[in-house]
Amino acid sequence: MRVAFLVDSVSNLKESQAQHLYVLPLFIIESTPEAETTFSSGFDIDLKTLTDKMANAPKGVKFSTSQTTEEIVRAKVSELVEQYDLIIGIPIDKEISASYANWKLVEKDYASKFHVLDARAVEMIIDWLINDIKGWLNTNPYSREGLDRFVEQYRKKTAAVLFVTDTKPLVAGGRLSNLKSFIIKSLKFHLLISFLGENGKLQFFDKARSAHDAHKLAVKFLKKQLLKHSAKLKRGAFLTTVFDEQTNTNLVQEFDKLLDHSINIEQSLLSPVICTHTGLNSYVIVLQGE
């Protein structure tokens, strides 16, 4: 059976026909008082370009995001069904974006070949999921029910914490109140936002006066959540909007120490579409249980 994977910009993956991996754009909108410019995240705007724009944006310039349209999904799927027996779709987490609904509309018309997963995943978690699905397909006959059950269990084993100091994008996107933002900024707190694969929701859960204290709180929280479902941790990832290599190396080493050197921590840049909401100098620690 020929299988392809279809994802979107939030995966931060590059399209590869050799790997049977295809990527659809999510969009970043730069709004000025005079006009709007739309970019395809990961296609015609990368993280460095976006963060430079955000850092140097004059007053009145705003950045927002937009979903993948039904028409874009439909066009790609209609092309892929001619080449593959099964297309597995993994769109951005439905708790973060309405894009998932557009994918499901297209799925109805290609039900025998297009399977959209309720993965509630973003970033590196999607890459891990693709690899684990490939392993599952090697040892299990494909069925919608079987793969959905596998993904439901997978979700329980993934979690992340986002570290934020620039709260303006979160306020603009309605994900943080002005009052909380004012308190955090005034007292120079580090804001911690959790992401649990089990429910796919982003939730403010704590704050800390120092980065080190924030990191300790995050690791404690993640281990508590994941070790309810797993005997031990399997892998980790550090995702960043920071371009200073030494800063990133120091952060990875700190997380490695807090995790007792128990897992390998991959390192990658955060996707532009997520950075639009998390702001400058944000970073994420992602963990997965066995």
Swiss-Prot record:
Residues 3-289 form the DegV domain. The keyword Transmembrane does not apply. It comes from the Bacteria. PROSITE patterns: DEGV. InterPro entries: DegV, DegV_C, DegV_domain_contain. Hexadecanoate binds at residues 65, 97. May bind long-chain fatty acids, such as palmitate, and may play a role in lipid transport or fatty acid metabolism. Keywords: Lipid-binding. It comes from Mycoplasma pneumoniae (strain ATCC 29342 / M129 / Subtype 1). This is DegV domain-containing protein MG450 homolog. GO terms for molecular function: lipid binding.
